[in-house]
């Protein structure tokens, strides 16, 4: 299936369940795909570490600078100064002002539940390193000849997982994509309603 047709189908599916269920449907989908994505990513990390021979073998198989977060300021990819100055701004913009992130918190039943949800999300971000960053480093150790880094995740999935698990991963990634698009559509509809339709009807 061509890429544009796949994107169109996923967009239509996302639009359908968003219009039918609203923010509640988006929230349930987010929880569902979160649990599955954590399970799949944790399984992939464990399988990758087992294949490469453990943490010690992984540390020896990749360059030492892969474990250094603060690189020289003349580093072409990750200079420390732009990262320290730029990432907090990007983080505040996305997590604190983006409508698709803010709207679920504002839709909480009360202030306490909204605070608990935001706090829980912050703790989940700790899992990014073992679940999403570490598999990329493991892939470098296992498949150093891989030319396209965008294919790292699925390369590990197809080589380390049985056929049934590969199907589950595809379903999880599809659910995550639909969830992201659904959140964006729901946020867009809210902004459009508040900024355009509400003013027009009010007049």
Description of each model-found segment:
Residues 7-11, 30, 40, 118, ...:
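Residue-level recognition of transmembrane alpha-helices
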Residues 198-203:
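Conserved small/polar residues in nucleotide/adenosyl-binding loops
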Residues 12-16, 85-92, 161, 171-181:
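Hydrophobic alpha-helical transmembrane segments of multi-pass membrane proteins
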Residues 165-196:
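Membrane-helix boundary/coupling elements in multi-pass transport proteins
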Residues 35-167:
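Loop-to-helix junctions at membrane interfaces in multi-pass transport proteins
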Residues 30, 34, 118-126, 172-176, ...:
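Transmembrane helix-bundle signature of multi-pass membrane transporters/permeases
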Residues 5, 24-25, 113-116, 167, ...:
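Residue-level recognition of membrane-helix boundary sites in multi-pass small-molecule transporters
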Residues 1-25, 40:
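Transmembrane alpha-helical segments of multi-pass small-molecule transport proteins
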């Amino acid at each position: 299936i061509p890429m544009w047709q796949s994107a169109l189908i996923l967009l239509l599916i996302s639009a359908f369940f968003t219009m039918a269920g609203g923010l509640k449907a988006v929230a349930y989908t987010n929880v569902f795909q979160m649990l599955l994505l954590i399970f799949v990513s944790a399984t992939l990390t464990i399988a990758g570490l087992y294949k490469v021979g453990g943490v010690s073998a992984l540390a020896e198989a990749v360059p030492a600078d892969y474990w250094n977060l603060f690189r020289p300021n003349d580093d072409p990819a990750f200079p420390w100064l732009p990262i320290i100055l730029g990432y907090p701004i990007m983080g505040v913009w996305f997590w604190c002002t983006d409508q698709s992130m803010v709207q679920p918190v504002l839709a909480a039943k009360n202030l306490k539940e909204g605070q608990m949800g935001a706090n829980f999300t912050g703790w989940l971000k700790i899992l990014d390193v073992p679940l999403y960053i570490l598999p990329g480093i493991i892939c470098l150790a296992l498949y150093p000849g891989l030319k396209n880094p965008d294919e790292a995740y699925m390369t590990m999935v197809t080589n380390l997982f049985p056929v049934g698990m590969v199907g589950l991963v595809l379903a999880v990634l599809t659910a995550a994509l639909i969830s992201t698009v659904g959140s964006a559509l729901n946020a867009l509809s809210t902004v459009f309603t508040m900024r355009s339709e509400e003013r027009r009807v009010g007049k």
